[in-house]
């Protein structure tokens, strides 16, 4: 049984648990063990009004800490009843934390567990995760289990995966079975952080917990990220039999994965399953399919999908057009590529720099230099070009066609326009000069490349050695080593 399949073993009835958002947020006494006194109940209104007044002062006065006591000399700000009312009336939880720290530093104030839990929960509700972590570290108190579960979720969402796992383990050591939401949040955090080993370690500990659509989504994503796309598909089919639909993202993930490995039969099955479950493929998914087909030299099949999209009333965007144009260029079908190019422009989609470079590269492969220069000049007129991508495309193309001097002109213009040449730029020029027996120019660039701390390619090194007609030992003695 595959790893993914073995995890879909059983489903458990939902456990009754506290909702962390339904904890006490309206503190009236510091301890639940103490009954409210009549005078405390009578003063509740005054505490509420005072809390509103202080909240306003904190928002509007920059140095409220220096004047608050003198403004209200007879008021006991350390009264736990007041602090509870302040937490309710203050919209900004960071202001509440600020007041708490001021209270602790100016009064002999020892907050009780209820106040601490309320403030900690408010920080989590406000997604102030780092502040909540600092608060927990400085106070050293032990939050309620429901808050710890919420804390795990917040840490995971913030990308603090190891911290989330640590708190999750604290709950486990306390004998508390975390909810399916908490478990899923930790697993999803591992996926986002690309920690697949940690994902599978944790999931093995969770095999008896509840399964839901989110868990299936996490498992399939993990299998696809690990290269087990087929196992992910099998898990999808099992989940759907149980009525667990993982959503459009998972279908897109599987489709992309099958496209990358060239399994178009399974890709088609996933696409039809997706539609059957009322998830209509987005243009992004169709772009992935077209790209995958083109990568596997199936441009005709890709164009059939592209054409069907238009026939069915879809409007392919610039990315889809560029993907199809690139596929045609890679195949050498430049006439078809240009036809789509002008169709795209006619529909109001302006080509971007990447699209121009696709066409330039395609025409370089065919040796159509005049068309290359036409596209390049048009790109410059439209405000593109002058970047590392476009400069390297032109330099490599010119050098491959014996036009290293033209390539060198672009190289010189790079520094004038603030574009710093990289190793690809230098290596292309070195090979280009050597190809035209301009070894001195190539050697000069080689030394410049080394001086900049960049690494020459093996092909550039071999071209120099070959044209200088020297052995590797002589080249090494002249400091022409690769590394």
From Swiss-Prot:
One Pfam assignment: PPR_2
PROSITE patterns: PPR
Keyword field contains DNA repair: no
Similarity section: Belongs to the PPR family. P subfamily.
Start-end of each PPR repeat: 144-178, 179-213, 218-246, 247-281, 282-316, 317-351, 352-386, 387-421, 422-456
Keywords recorded for this protein, A-Z: Repeat
NCBIfam families, A to Z: PPR
Leader sequence segment: none
Natural source organism: Arabidopsis thaliana (Mouse-ear cress)
Taxonomic superkingdom: Eukaryota
Keyword Chloroplast: no
InterPro entries: Pentatricopeptide_rpt, PPR_P_subfamily, TPR-like_helical_dom_sf
Protein name, as recorded: Pentatricopeptide repeat-containing protein At5g18950
């Amino acid at each position: 049984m595959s790893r993914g399949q073995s995890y879909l073993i059983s489903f458990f009835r939902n456990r009754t648990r506290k909702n962390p958002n339904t904890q006490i947020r309206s503190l009236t006494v510091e301890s639940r063990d103490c009954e409210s006194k009549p005078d405390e109940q009578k003063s509740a209104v005054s505490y509420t009004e005072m809390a509103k007044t202080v909240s306003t002062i904190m928002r509007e006065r920059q140095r409220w800490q220096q004047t608050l006591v003198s403004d209200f000399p007879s008021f006991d700000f350390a009264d736990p009843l007041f602090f509870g009312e302040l937490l309710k009336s203050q919209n900004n939880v960071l202001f509440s934390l600020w007041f708490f720290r001021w209270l602790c530093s100016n009064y002999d104030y020892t907050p009780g567990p209820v106040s601490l839990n309320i403030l900690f929960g408010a920080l989590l509700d406000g997604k102030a995760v780092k502040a909540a972590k600092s608060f927990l570290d400085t106070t050293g108190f032990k939050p309620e289990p429901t808050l710890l579960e919420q804390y795990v979720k917040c840490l995971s969402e913030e990308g603090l995966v190891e911290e989330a796992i640590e708190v999750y383990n604290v709950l486990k050591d306390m004998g508390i079975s975390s909810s399916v939401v908490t478990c899923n949040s930790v697993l999803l955090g591992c996926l986002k952080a690309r920690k697949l080993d940690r994902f599978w370690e944790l999931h093995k500990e969770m095999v008896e917990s509840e399964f839901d659509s989110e868990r299936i989504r996490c498992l399939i994503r993990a299998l696809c990220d690990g290269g087990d796309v087929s196992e992910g598909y099998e898990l999808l089919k099992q989940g759907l039999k149980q009525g667990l639909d993982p959503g459009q993202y998972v279908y897109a993930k599987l489709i992309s994965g099958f496209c990358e490995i060239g399994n178009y039969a399974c890709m088609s099955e996933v696409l039809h399953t997706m539609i059957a479950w009322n998830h209509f493929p987005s243009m992004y998914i169709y772009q992935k399919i077209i790209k995958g087909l083109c990568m596997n030299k199936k441009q005709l099949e890709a164009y059939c999908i592209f054409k069907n999209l238009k026939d069915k009333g879809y409007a392919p965007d610039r990315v889809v057009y560029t993907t199809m144009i690139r596929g045609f260029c890679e195949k050498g079908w430049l006439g078809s590529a240009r036809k789509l190019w002008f169709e795209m422009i006619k529909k109001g989609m302006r080509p971007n720099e990447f699209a121009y470079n696709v066409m330039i590269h395609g025409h370089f492969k065919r040796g159509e230099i005049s068309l290359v220069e036409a596209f390049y000049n048009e790109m410059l007129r439209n405000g593109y070009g002058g970047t590392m991508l476009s400069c390297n495309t032109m330099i490599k193309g010119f050098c491959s066609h014996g036009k290293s001097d033209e390539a060198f002109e672009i190289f010189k213009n790079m520094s004038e326009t603030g574009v710093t040449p990289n190793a690809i730029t230098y290596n292309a020029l070195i090979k280009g000069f050597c190809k035209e027996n301009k070894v001195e120019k190539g050697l000069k660039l080689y030394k410049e490349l080394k001086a900049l701390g960049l690494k020459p390619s093996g092909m550039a090194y071999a071209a120099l050695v070959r044209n200088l007609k020297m052995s590797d030992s002589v080249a090494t003695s002249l400091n022409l080593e690769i590394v």
